[in-house]
Amino acid sequence: MNTNNILETIKMIEEEKLDVRTITMGISLLDCIDPDGDKARIKIYDKITKSAEHLVEVGRQIETEFGIPIVNKRVSITPMSIIAGATNETSYVEFARTLDRAAETLGIDFLGGFSALVQKGCTKGDKILISSIPEALAVTKKVCASVNVGCTKSGINMNAVRDMADVIKRTAELTKDQKGFGCAKLVVFANAVEDNPFMAGAFHGVGEAERIINVGVSGPGVVKRALEKVRGASFDVVAETIKQTAFKVTRMGELVANEASRRLDVPFGIVDLSLAPTPAVGDSVAEILEEIGLEQVGTHGTIAALAMLNDAVKKGGVMACSHVGGLSGAFIPVSEDAGMIDAVISGSLNLEKLEGMTCVCSVGLDMIAIPGDTPASTIAGMIADEAAIGVINNKTTAVRIIPAPGCEIGDMVEFGGLLGRAPVMKVNGKSSELFAQRGGRIPAPIHSFKN
């Protein structure tokens, strides 16, 4: 074993903030379906708490034995609209309470899967779940919700887009004492993936196994340090440096995933290669882009730098691990990235530039605060724009946006912890009302017909 590699890994962890962001156990709840809501909730609670009873303990053991920080232990479940749809209940808030109670019992950080997949239309259960989201997120601490409103094969469900804009507004209102924090636990997707370990968008797809272990890594600080050593070099060298660094980071993620899988006796699913920033200085995707040569993120060249970063991360990661999945790229959540926050405050980075950046990176408009009086129709337009980027480019896109109640442009919304703080950003003041009112479906793009 190469001593230099060992010392390099120790340095990456101690000085460059390398960590495993999450070990997420996916759990199928299909065998918990019951027409009696009370019985279904008992089955759900028992299945989750039994399946993941050792998850936190094993995570801590691996952290201690290997010296690798594991920030979060999480659970994802089969989309709840499928499970609860068998009942005759008119609200699924009690299901959310059951999930929250299970999460508290396990001691995990978050539980994802209060979700619905409505890219082509809504079932009765989907409609009830969507209408239940605001109250469900207001009365729970650890439950996360997501709704998939579009995909490349089906187009965009504009009725669902309009409904989700209203849901976001209502969620912000019900959690206004926390500056709309409920919206930080809610994601609207296009092309959602079934094996995502990251919150708030994780759910356990129906094509997945009974239980599965998915791991998400995090290493923006490591990539930035590596690039500091090649200042002034060509883009060829920059891309190769990022690729080699991503390889090392992913190897560590695979080690943790395999070890967790073995100890929990649960199959290993995937490693998600995503570079996930934190609010800490030196753990920022924006700082990587600035190290590549931008005075500040948001200036011209930002999208090209981000595209190269995203691609190089994927290339390095797939060489390190046979099973790569989830979102796998670079996250650009404004509130969780110190460099992004600074760029917004200085005026270098605006909402329109962020939309452009989402065309070439991992997800979409993420953890962005906007004025609390932003109309639902404007939010619907933002969701539709992001969904269109995902559907046309055959990639995952998402919107996790917080219309902060009582806040205006320039105010700072404090969330704390990994969610950080978000400067309230300006949105276009022109109306999208007539656009949002149309409803129906935007058809799938011509290049989706590949059979």
Swiss-Prot record:
UniProt name for this protein: UPF0210 protein Cbei_2352
Pfam family, one: DUF711
PANTHER family the record matches: UPF0210 PROTEIN MJ1665, UPF0210 PROTEIN SPR0218
Family of the protein in this entry: Belongs to the UPF0210 family.
Subunit structure of this chain's protein: Homodimer.
Family matches, as HAMAP family: UPF0210
Cross-referenced CDD domains: RNR_PFL_like_DUF711
